[in-house]
From Swiss-Prot:
Protein name per UniProt: Exodeoxyribonuclease 7 small subunit
Protein source organism: Rickettsia prowazekii (strain Madrid E)
Known partners and oligomeric status: Heterooligomer composed of large and small subunits.
GO MF, one annotated term: exodeoxyribonuclease VII activity
Keywords: Cytoplasm, Exonuclease, Hydrolase, Nuclease
GO biological process: DNA catabolic process
Length: 80
């Protein structure tokens, strides 16, 4: 795990979320010393912000698609 001040934009939402979950587990269980925990917390904030950015981008893309779509679009539930 690198602890840079910024995240590369090419890290996927899923990768960032997975790493964030690992950080939370480590901090919650007290597996890290104070300095490492603070660095992990800082990394966690970066990951959280990255995930929020990715979610916002996805939401805006969906809204744009919805606005461009014909108003007769019908959403149907499908079974998996």
């Amino acid at each position: 795990m690198t602890n840079t001040k910024t995240l590369k934009d090419n890290i996927s939402f899923e990768e960032a979320l997975r790493e964030l979950e690992e950080i939370v587990k480590k901090i919650d269980t007290g597996q890290e010393n104070l300095e490492t925990a603070v660095n992990s917390f800082e990394r966690g904030i970066l990951l959280k912000n990255h995930c929020e950015k990715k979610l916002k981008e996805a939401r805006l893309k969906i809204e744009k698609i919805t606005k461009l779509a014909d108003s007769t679009v019908i959403l149907e539930e499908t079974e998996v």
